[in-house]
Amino acid sequence: PDLCLSDEFQAEPKQLSVNFKEVDHVEKAIAEADVILVEPVVQPDYTKSRDERTGELSLTPANYKITREVLEKKAKSDAILLHSLPRMDEVPVDVDITRWSRYWQEAFNGVVMRMTLLALVLGAME
């Protein structure tokens, strides 16, 4: 599938004077990034168990995967890597223990934030 941004999608940031560029490989953009936000390129079918969708496990094109090697060769030492989770194959598990990984903290902070918002909405706190 064509993974380029459509003209329609590019129009809005251009109208807002957002400075962006489109590249065909993460290695071309990662060296400049302070924050690397990764999302699945192809959305898996979550109605099936992981065992049932074994054929889907290699859905991310290699040029869009954030591997440990790419991070070690290209990323800034103080950059952070975020992911909304759950992940498929776009970020291999060996990236979890690198200095860039912040997605587990991101997930924890999201739980705390949702708990706080629920408590506020339900009147348990002011």
Kindly label every feature range from the protein language model.
Residues 78-126:
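Adenosine-phosphate binding glycine-rich loop
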Residues 10-11, 50-53, 95-98:
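Short, glycine/charged-enriched secondary-structure capping and boundary segments
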Residues 1-39, 44:
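Glycine-rich phosphate/diphosphate-binding loop of Rossmann-like nucleotide-binding domains
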Residues 68-78:
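Short, conserved loop/helix-junction motifs that constitute active-site signature segments
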Residues 3-5, 68, 108:
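Donor-nucleotide binding loops and adjacent catalytic segments primarily
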Residues 26, 67-68:
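Acidic, amphipathic alpha-helical patches
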